[in-house]
């Protein structure tokens, strides 16, 4: 399965799940299959999550828009991303500007089956090696292992066993909060599941209106790049989105601040 086909399968699986599965008291993080999918909802705080593996064409715009507004975000990058020389300036900027840097697996492997989620597709040792290699790549940028606590699994797809193995490494597995189409910003115009930036933007604001807690505690996931298959880049709406949400009283914080 190609990375793009795998991502399509992930989106279909996630979007088929009922939102009621994530409801919890306002003061507690919400969990699914052992992973955190939403932070406390008592305050108007949002944790923006950005994952990256092969592409990074949106990263500079994202960082610029955050810097203009004094916002903080969290970036989860694979080892392959971190070892790509062309991406090194982006990684250094993420760190220098005070954002969180965490792992997203080393090689972006599929950890569990799409249709039988409880079926893990690799051994515990292979999993640990993959994550540890990613952590070493992060350490290569001067971010010590002790400062890395939260991580997002590849394809944003995992099961309870993967969450448990993560805890064995001293890591807390987190994912994105369902209810918007933000994570579909990787889809290309030629894909059957393409979601335009306008639809993504509208879905986020619709969720803010409809959820009893708005977007408080949200883990809102986007990508640092979608590649050449998508001309309609979501980063063109990112600054506008930040302004609208800030106007409604939201602050943009790192995941370790939201979940501490």
Regions found by a protein language model. Give the residues of each.
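Bacterial Sec-dependent signal peptides at the C-terminal "C-region" and cleavage site
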Residues: 10, 17-30
